[in-house]
Amino acid sequence: MISLLISLLIFEIVIEIDFSYVCIVETNSMNTNITEKKYKKLSIQVALNGLSFCCFDTLNNTITSFNEVHFDTFHKATKTEDLFADAFSDYPELKESYDEILIIHNNNLSTFVPEPLFDENFLGSYLQYNTKVFETDFFAFDEIANCQMNTVYIPYVNINNFFIDQFGTFEYKHANTILVSKLLIASKNNPEKKMVVHINSGHFEIIVVQNQKLLLFNSFDYTTPEDFLYYILFTAEQLGLNPEEFPLELIGKIDTESEYYQLAYKYIRNVSLVDVSDLQAKNTFSEAENRTHFILFNS
């Protein structure tokens, strides 16, 4: 509880920073001669319990294929890299040639720091308030230039090393960089404070935005619907948001029949799922798949 309060207090600083910019995350493409360009991009979202990936047609801005691999059960002695190697054997499209390759690290080891308060020499200090850090940890950051802030996080170094062996060069970033950037863009010209909750397996993120300002970001572990509801209501109370009034939008692995949705709906008046119709127009996958894989499909 103490760490939660500290994290919430830290983000009161963020409230004072004006993020009134069109927040577009700039990416650097791999060097490709125009005559060799294939107009193909591969994005792989990685976690310790599996991976998902999709292929993009960059000429038409569409998603051409998508697959998901779960590491349901495996022996403790099994290396994560071996499980990824098996996935590469099972899915030949992972070995095809691409103009761009993006690796997306999905974990709850991240935070956001406004540019005026950011110093890349002290990355670990930003994370120590909401996660346990060690001297041996490797820290990285994603610059979100047009939002004047940075995502600070701990990537999966062993997984990055595996991809170096597979691809040689690639770009990587944190999943929450993509998530928050998209939510800030969507909040443009909306003066209302909105809470968005992104549900992952075992953890979820709470993001509060208002007209391209990031008012709060925090990540929580959970095991029950009651855990889920408690953190939402506690965060709302800290920010002075009235459960009878503020809009709560849910995204990720959730639908209206979920017990998590039903419990939130019981205590918060304005609950809905994030609208993914614009994203769905760029692919042939279902609304539920677009909601679950919102970050990957927006990469």
Task: State the predicted function of each range.
Residues 4-299:
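Hydrophobic/aromatic-enriched cytosolic interaction surfaces used to assemble or bind macromolecules
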